Design a protein with these regions (language model features):
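Feature captures outer-membrane beta-barrel proteins of Gram-negative bacteria and organelles
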Residues: 58-66, 103-111, 151-159
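Gram-negative outer-membrane beta-barrel transporters
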Residues: 1-87
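Extracellular loop and loop/strand-boundary signature of outer-membrane beta-barrel proteins
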Residues: 1-2, 44-52, 92-97, 140-145
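Active-site lining segments that contact anionic ligands and/or coordinate catalytic metals
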Residues: 74, 102-106, 127
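Outer-membrane beta-barrel transmembrane domain signature
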Residues: 84, 96-106
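C-terminal beta-signal and adjacent terminal beta-strands/loops
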Residues: 71, 82-90, 110-161
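Surface-exposed coil/turn segments at beta-strand junctions on protein surfaces, enriched
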Residues: 19-21, 55, 100, 121, ...
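Exposed loop/turn and edge beta-strand positions of beta-sandwich/beta-sheet ligand-binding modules
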Residues: 8, 24, 58, 103, ...
């Protein structure tokens, strides 16, 4: 548990959406965060004024989506890149507690279909997705000594009423 923490930062988000011919579209999103979160509990502590554990100064993401849609179905291919910058795993910001930055690349392919009654009213939406997470099979720990999975796959089928 921490006492007093002083937090300052900046968040920047942007999104572009392009409508292309023949029902195609392209979307791009970028997010960046700069954050200082320093312990200001007790000036006598060795870690007074240090960045608190596991809070990076820099982090961000980039997402791209290429898709196609019509009145009752859509398909899209998604790419995402997530970056978490250097940080420390304990209260003291010393070399021994330093934690390397990490990043991942992920891909997904999604299809969605609206299923209708004969009168045209939508009954439900069927969605199928195939995800490939950590595409480059990076070794990284979000928390020290808790390694995240290397490349992994997920297949999802869902129905929404």
């Amino acid at each position: 548990n921490l006492g007093l923490v002083k937090i300052n930062g900046l968040d920047v988000n942007t999104q572009l959406h392009f409508v292309l011919p023949k029902n195609f579209y392209l979307t791009a999103k970028v997010q960046y965060t700069y954050q200082t979160a320093i312990d200001v509990t007790d000036p006598a502590d060795n870690y007074y004024g240090h960045q608190i554990p596991y809070i990076p100064w820099h982090s961000g993401s980039a997402v791209g989506m290429f898709g196609w849609s019509n009145d009752w179905m859509q398909y899209h291919l998604n790419y995402s890149f997530i970056y978490v910058g250097e940080r420390y795993n304990q209260q003291e910001n010393i070399l021994y507690n330093y934690t390397q930055p990490w990043y991942t690349h992920d891909l997904s392919l999604v299809g969605e279909w609206d299923i209708h009654k004969a009168q045209g009213k939508r009954l439900f939406t069927l969605r199928a997705a195939l995800d490939v997470n950590n595409l480059l099979s990076q070794d990284y720990d979000v928390i020290l000594n808790y390694p995240m999975p290397k490349r992994n796959y997920k297949c999802t089928i869902s129905i929404t009423y």
